[in-house]
Amino acid sequence: MPMAMNSPKRVQFLTASLSFVLAAGFAVAASAQDAPDVGPHPPQPLKAMESHIGNITGHSKDAKSDYRRYCAGCHGDLGDGNGENAVWLDPRPRDFTMATFKCRSTLTGTLPTDEDLFNTIARGLTNSNMPIWNTFTKQQRADLVAYIKTFSPRWEKEKAGEPIKIPAEPAVTMESISHGKALFTKLECWKCHGPQGKGDGPSAATLTDSKDQPIRPYNFASGKDDSRFKCGSTNQDVYKIFITGVDGTPMPSFADVIHPNDAWDLVHFLRTLQVDRHSKENDILKAAHGVIPPYTEKQAIAPASHGENRAAGGGS
């Protein structure tokens, strides 16, 4: 015979069942509290940072909106280079958590200056998806520099490196171009960049960056009158690359390998590889099957004035 709904046995059965369910629930909850947290972590509050560019002070707290609107799509909310657009981009967006930057005025392995990051935002990066952000005000750029610095603890523990000293550019001569060509061979630049600087050297297909992503050497021969190198368009910008290297890539620093003036000779030679570009170097050297014509005194060109050098200086 079925038990009555209000019988003592029915009440005891329901009470025991409820007690078991509650006990199991408490056990699961306790176990979850004791278990290690292996799920995704929510973004942690960012430490306030500042940047200093001339007489402008940037504040990270003032860049949150701009970063999320203009930068997070590629660089990610956490600054790790894993924004929703990143999977479609080549090269991948910069991972700010590593605090490793390509365009710097400081020696390899050191943090860039605030001015370096400021200039990179304004200038963009050639042959990448990093655009020119010259529509931002200087204050917005300074604030973004401060915000970028919140993503890595390196900025709390280390100071930015000292900017390298760039000696005055010597006159462009056939001698300097010839010496630069010899250095290009001796330093084995051709292994990556190719004998004609087209980025097609024998090692080009094997190169990877610091995240093991394929990376292409720069094609110097593609230059036009409006061309820019990765970190700028002036001869001073190219000079810096030889001394600072390009961190996060196979491009090393030659600061301990060559004399400062040797770097200028390399710059002058590289300009001649841009055969479609009108330059003082190509006014001297009209490439003819890669043969350098004899040097004459009339081919010497005076270096830029001090004012021009100063105007071309600054960050990366």
Name these PLM-found stretches.
Residues 29-34:
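Boundary at the C-terminal end of the N-terminal hydrophobic targeting segment
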Residues 57-73:
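Mature N-terminal segment immediately following signal peptide/propeptide cleavage
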Residues 4-18:
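Bacterial N-terminal signal peptides that target proteins for export
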Residues 15-27:
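Bacterial N-terminal signal peptides
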Residues 36-50, 57, 68, 131-215, ...:
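Flexible coil segments in periplasmic/lumen-exposed cytochrome c-class electron-transfer proteins
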Residues 84, 103-112, 116-145, 243-267:
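Axial heme c-ligation environment in periplasmic c-type cytochrome domains
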Residues 75, 97, 149-152, 193, ...:
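Protein kinase-like catalytic domain
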Residues 64, 76-114, 135, 181, ...:
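Gly/Gly-Pro-rich "capping" loops immediately C-terminal to redox-active cysteine motifs
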